[in-house]
C-alpha cells in the first residue's frame, strides 16, 4: 500500500506518529509537509505576512501545485490529509477524479474553529469530498454521518520510549499542581480563579506572563521532547483543561498523561469516563469548586496510594493500546477497507 500523507512535519505534529508506524507496518508513505511549507513562508518575515493578508501571495497556489506534482510522481493508493487548511477543495477534487480515495483526520474540529490555526474555508468546503473522516470526537462523527460521510473514531494517543518511561519513574515527585499548555481565554480565566481560591499552580507555556500575575501562579517556558515527559510525570497533580472544540471529548494530554503514569485531574467528559476509571486511574471534576476539592484530595493522598494510581493508569494505557503504534494499526485497518 502507498499512502500520501499531507500535513505538517514539525516535531509536535501528530501525523509524524502515523508516518512512523505505518512505515513500520510495511506501508510506503510519502509525507508532504503542506502546513510546514505555509508556516515557513508566513513566519519568515513581516513582509510575507502583509503580502499574504493582502491576498497577493501565491504561497497556497504553490503548495497546491506541489501537492498535485508529488501525487503524480508518487501514485498513491490513498491520500490522507491532516486538517487541510492549505489544500484547496479543487486539488482534492482533482485527486478524486483519479479515483484515489481521500481520508481526513482533524485534530481540532471541522465544525468549530477555536483559533486562527484551527480551520478555514478550505476545511469547511472540503468535507463532502472525503471518503473517510477519522476523528477523536464523537460529536464530529455524528455530524459527519448526517452529511453522509463515512466516519470512524481514532482517539489521540502517546508515543513514549520504554527507557524514558523508566527514567521518569525515578523522578522525585513534587506535591504540587502543574498545567502544561499555552494560554487562551478559557484557560486563563480558570487558572486565575484557581489562584484566587489559594491554589498554587506551576504553568508551562508561551506568553503566560501577558495574562496572569499572581503570587500563586509560577510561570515557566514550554517544555518539549524528553523534558516534556519528565515534567508531565514529576508533579503530583497534572491539570488538563479542554478547549471550545473538545469540551465533551478528550485531548492529546489525556493519553500523554496516562502513558507516562501521571496523576491527571481532568474535566468529567464522556470520553474521560469511558477511557479511564475515576478515582483509580484519573480524577475528574465538573466545575471550579469540585476541581479545588479534587486538588486537595490528590495532594493529601499517601505516597503509596498515589503510586498505585500511577501504576493503574500506565497499565490501562498498555493493556488497552492507547499508544500511537496501536492507533496506527487501527487506522491501517480503515485504510485497507477503502481499497479492498
Model feature map: region roles:
Residues 282-288, 297-303:
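Conserved acidic donor-binding segment of nucleotide-sugar-dependent glycosyltransferases
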Residues 34, 107, 156, 286-287:
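Active-site donor-binding loop signature of nucleotide-sugar glycosyltransferases
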Residues 1-52, 58-66, 73-74, 82-89, ...:
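Nucleotide-sugar donor-binding catalytic core of glycosyltransferases
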Residues 300-335:
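A charged, aromatic-enriched C-terminal amphipathic alpha-helix characteristic of glycosyltransferases
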Residues 81-84, 95-102:
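Short, conserved structural micro-motifs that define repeat-unit consensus positions
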Residues 103-117:
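A short, histidine- and acid-enriched strand-loop-helix "catalytic/donor-clamping" loop
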Amino acid at each position: 500500500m502507498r499512502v500520501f500523507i499531507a500535513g505538517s512535519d514539525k516535531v509536535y505534529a501528530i501525523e509524524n506518529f502515523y508516518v512512523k508506524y505505518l512505515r513500520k507496518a510495511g506501508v510506503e508513505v510519502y509525507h508532504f509537509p503542506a502546513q510546514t511549507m505555509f508556516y515557513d513562508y508566513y513566519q519568515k518575515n513581516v513582509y510575507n505576512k502583509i503580502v499574504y493578508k493582502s491576498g497577493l501571495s501565491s504561497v497556497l497556489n504553490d503548495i497546491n501545485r506541489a501537492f498535485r506534482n508529488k501525487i503524480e510522481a508518487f501514485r498513491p493508493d490513498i491520500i490522507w490529509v491532516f486538517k487541510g487548511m492549505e489544500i484547496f477543495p479543487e486539488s482534492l477534487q482533482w485527486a478524486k477524479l483519479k479515483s484515489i480515495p481521500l481520508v481526513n483526520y482533524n485534530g481540532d474540529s471541522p465544525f468549530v474553529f477555536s483559533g486562527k490555526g484551527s480551520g478555514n474555508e478550505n476545511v469547511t468546503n472540503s468535507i463532502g469530498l472525503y471518503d473517510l473522516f477519522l476523528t477523536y470526537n464523537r460529536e464530529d462523527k455524528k455530524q459527519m454521518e448526517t452529511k453522509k460521510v463515512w466516519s470512524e473514531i481514532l482517539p489521540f494517543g502517546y508515543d513514549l520510549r520504554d527507557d524514558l518511561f523508566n527514567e521518569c519513574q525515578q523522578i522525585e515527585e513534587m506535591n504540587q499542581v502543574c498545567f502544561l499548555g499555552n494560554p487562551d481565554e478559557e484557560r486563563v480565566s480558570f487558572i486565575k480563579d484557581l489562584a484566587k481560591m489559594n491554589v498554587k499552580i506551576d504553568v508551562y507555556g508561551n506568553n503566560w506572563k501577558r495574562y496572569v500575575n499572581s503570587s500563586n501562579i509560577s510561570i515557566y517556558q514550554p517544555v518539549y521532547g524528553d523534558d516534556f515527559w519528565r515534567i508531565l510525570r514529576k508533579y503530583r497533580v497534572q491539570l488538563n483543561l479542554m478547549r471550545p472544540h473538545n469540551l465533551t471529548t478528550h485531548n492529546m494530554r489525556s493519553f500523554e498523561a496516562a502513558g507516562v503514569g501521571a496523576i491527571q485531574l481532568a474535566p468529567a467528559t464522556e470520553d474521560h469516563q469511558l477511557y479511564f476509571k475515576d478515582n483509580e486511574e484519573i480524577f475528574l471534576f465538573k466545575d471550579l469548586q469540585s476541581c479545588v476539592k479534587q486538588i486537595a484530595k490528590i495532594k493529601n493522598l499517601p505516597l503509596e496510594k498515589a503510586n498505585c494510581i500511577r501504576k493503574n493508569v500506565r497499565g490501562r494505557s498498555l493493556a488497552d493500546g492507547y499508544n500511537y503504534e496501536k492507533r496506527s494499526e487501527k487506522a491501517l485497518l480503515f485504510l485497507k477497507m477503502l481499497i479492498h
